Every structure is written in C-alpha cells, then in structure tokens.
C-alpha cells in the first residue's frame, strides 16, 4: 500500500530554505510588530496631533535609534501630517565620536541639530568618586533639551523609554518611595511648558535590542560613567528578567495592569471618597465625625487602662 502525501496548500507561504532569507523574514516580522505597537501607543494616548513638530531625542543608543526609525516609517503613512527633528545633546564626554550621528542622519535625510553643552565637566566635578552620575546627568540633559524645544517651536518631545523601563520605574517607586507610580506614556513637564511622549511604551526591550542589531544602528555607548547603572534599578532589572524566564508573560501582565487602575480597591483617599461610603441618606459631609476625634478617643481609652 502506497502512502499518499498531502500536497501543500497553493496559498501557503513556504518557509525559506536559505538561512539568510529566513533571517530577513524574521526581521521583517519583528519590524512590523514594533510598528504596530508604536502605532497603537500613539493612538491610545493621542501622542501625535496634526501639524506637530516632534523632537526625537537621539542619544545614540538602541532605544532612541529604534524610536526614530519607527517614527520615520509611520510618518510616511500616518493619518495626520507631522514633522520630525532629531536632536542630540553633545555632553562633551571624552572620546565621544561626534561624527557618528551627523553622518547617520545626513544619510537618512533627517533634519537634526546637535546641542553642545558641557555637562560632563559639571557632573564630574559635583558627583563624588564612586557615586552614580545618572540622576544629575539626567536632570542636566533634560534641562538642555527642554530649552531647545522652547526656542525651536517643538510641540512634542519624544523619549525612547520602553515597556521594561516603565515597569522597572513602577517597582523603583514601590520599593524605595512607597508610591504607586511609573512613567506615563504621555505627560506634561513639571513646568507645564512641554508635552513629553514615549512611543515605545508598549515595546519590549528584548525586541528593541534584536531590531537594533538587525538594522545595524551605529550604537554609541555612554562613557560618561562607564555605562554604570543605578544599583537599585539594576536589581529591579534582574528581578524582572528572572520573572520573564521563570514565568513568561508576568512582566507583560504587570505592564497591562498599569493601564487598569481601580482606585476604589486601593487606599488613596485623594482618588476615592471612602468617607462617603455608608453615609446614611443625604447627610452632608460636614456632619461626619472629625477623623481626629477617633485618635482622641483612642488616646483616652489607653489612658484609662
């Protein structure tokens, strides 16, 4: 008896036999995934409006390269017109390859500016030896970029923080500051003058790393502090990596939970009126007992014992 082998479906997409073709297909699939996630974040949070001038903060790292690449691709088919300008802050770090970004951006035909500000000397002078420079460096960098945005008609400032950054920041705030807070995908700066967006808010860092490697971006390492990482953030990062390895999908669930907050199931009295619960009839709030009276009563009870 002869076996009858099933014929392949005529519309099926045959798997490429050439490893290079397979790699190209995987890269194409990854690029489409990132485009979809970035587009979803832009839509969900209203990140881009018609006529926006978006300053893409380009550090030379994998995240900011990927963000610029995604925005350029989406710009060609976006439902609203907007312009991009790539801005890099030259902090005058020793041996910084100042030619890399201009050459890359010139080849792309992307409008760009290099803002020169010697924050390296300031940070090196102020921060004690052996201490992390990240916090001060970040504040100085943010101030310089905000100043550029103010004087160049920028309407949105795009930063390259991704999903893992947002989740890590949530745990940093939880563990070290006793508050439930992360990085908002879209926010107004503390001075009220700027709107900041994070188009990579839905994108995993591992996917960004794979995409950056596939695209062969000319990565510039941060040598200001030897690429040192804040120890606390490093510990949180290891925790998230362990979870991803042991319980795949857990970090994704945490990221999704940040968009599903139930104030009535927490304990923040500024977000939910707990005093109104159980109030009889239409009794006005001023008839409710003064919360301080309960403390007084408690103290009196202890004094009588």
UniProtKB/Swiss-Prot annotation:
Organism encoding this protein: Xanthomonas oryzae pv. oryzae (strain KACC10331 / KXO85)
GO cellular component, one term: cytoplasm
Catalysed reaction equations from the record: cytidine(32) in tRNA + S-sulfanyl-L-cysteinyl-[cysteine desulfurase] + AH2 + ATP = 2-thiocytidine(32) in tRNA + L-cysteinyl-[cysteine desulfurase] + A + AMP + diphosphate + H(+)
Cofactor: Mg(2+); [4Fe-4S] cluster
Protein location: Cytoplasm
Assembly information from the UniProt record: Homodimer.
Pathway(s) per entry: tRNA modification
Bias type Low complexity, positions: 282-293
Name of the protein this chain belongs to: tRNA-cytidine(32) 2-sulfurtransferase
InterPro entries: Rossmann-like_a/b/a_fold (IPR014729), TilS/TtcA_N (IPR011063), tRNA_Cyd_32_2_STrfase (IPR012089), tRNA_thiolation_TtcA_Ctu1 (IPR035107)
UniProt-listed PANTHER family: AMINOTRAN_5 DOMAIN-CONTAINING PROTEIN, SULFURTRANSFERASE-RELATED
Entry's Gene Ontology molecular function annotations: 4 iron, 4 sulfur cluster binding; ATP binding; magnesium ion binding; sulfurtransferase activity; tRNA binding
Taxonomic lineage of the native organism: Bacteria, Pseudomonadati, Pseudomonadota, Gammaproteobacteria, Lysobacterales
HAMAP family: TtcA
Residue window of motif PP-loop motif: 59-64
Gene: ttcA
Family the UniProt entry places it in: Belongs to the TtcA family.
Enzyme class, spelled out: transferase
One of the protein's GO biological processes: tRNA thio-modification
EC number assigned by the record: 2.8.1.-
Region entry Disordered, spans: 1-20, 282-305
Entry function: Catalyzes the ATP-dependent 2-thiolation of cytidine in position 32 of tRNA, to form 2-thiocytidine (s(2)C32). The sulfur atoms are provided by the cysteine/cysteine desulfurase (IscS) system.
Cofactor note: Binds 1 [4Fe-4S] cluster per subunit. The cluster is chelated by three Cys residues, the fourth Fe has a free coordination site that may bind a sulfur atom transferred from the persulfide of IscS.
Miscellaneous comment in the UniProt entry for this protein: The thiolation reaction likely consists of two steps: a first activation step by ATP to form an adenylated intermediate of the target base of tRNA, and a second nucleophilic substitution step of the sulfur (S) atom supplied by the hydrosulfide attached to the Fe-S cluster.
Keyword line: 4Fe-4S, ATP-binding, Cytoplasm, Iron, Iron-sulfur, Magnesium, Metal-binding, Nucleotide-binding, RNA-binding, Transferase, tRNA processing, tRNA-binding
Binding-site positions, [4Fe-4S] cluster: 134, 137, 225
Disulfide bonds: none
């Amino acid at each position: 008896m002869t076996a009858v082998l099933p014929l392949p479906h005529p519309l099926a997409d045959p798997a490429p036999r050439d490893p290079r073709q397979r790699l190209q297909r995987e890269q194409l699939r990854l690029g489409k995934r990132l485009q979809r996630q970035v587009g979803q974040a832009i839509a969900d949070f209203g990140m881009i409006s018609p006529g926006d001038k978006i300053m893409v903060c380009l550090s030379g790292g994998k995240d900011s390269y990927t963000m610029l690449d995604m925005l350029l691709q989406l710009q060609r088919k976006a439902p609203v017109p907007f312009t991009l300008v790539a801005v890099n802050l030259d902090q005058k770090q020793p041996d910084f390859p100042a030619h890399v970004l201009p050459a890359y951006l010139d080849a792309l035909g992307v409008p760009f500016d290099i803002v020169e500000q010697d924050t390296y000397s300031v940070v090196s002078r102020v921060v004690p030896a052996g201490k992390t420079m990240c916090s001060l460096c970040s504040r100085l960098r943010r101030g310089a970029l905000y100043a550029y945005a103010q004087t160049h008609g920028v309407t949105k400032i795009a930063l390259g923080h991704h999903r893992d950054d947002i989740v890590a920041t949530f745990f940093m705030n939880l563990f070290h500051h006793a508050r439930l807070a992360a990085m908002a995908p879209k926010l107004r700066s503390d001075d009220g003058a700027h709107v900041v967006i994070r188009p990579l808010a839905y994108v995993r860092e591992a996917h960004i790393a794979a995409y950056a490697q596939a695209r062969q971006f000319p990565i510039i390492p941060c040598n200001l502090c030897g690429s040192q990482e804040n120890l606390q953030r490093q510990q949180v990062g290891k925790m998230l990596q362990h979870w991803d390895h042991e319980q795949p999908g857990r970090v994704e669930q945490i990221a999704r939970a940040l968009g599903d907050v139930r104030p009535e199931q927490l304990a923040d009295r500024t977000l939910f009126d707990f005093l109104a619960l159980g109030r009889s009839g239409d009794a006005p709030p001023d008839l409710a007992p003064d919360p301080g009276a309960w403390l007084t009563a408690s103290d009196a009870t202890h004094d009588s014992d």
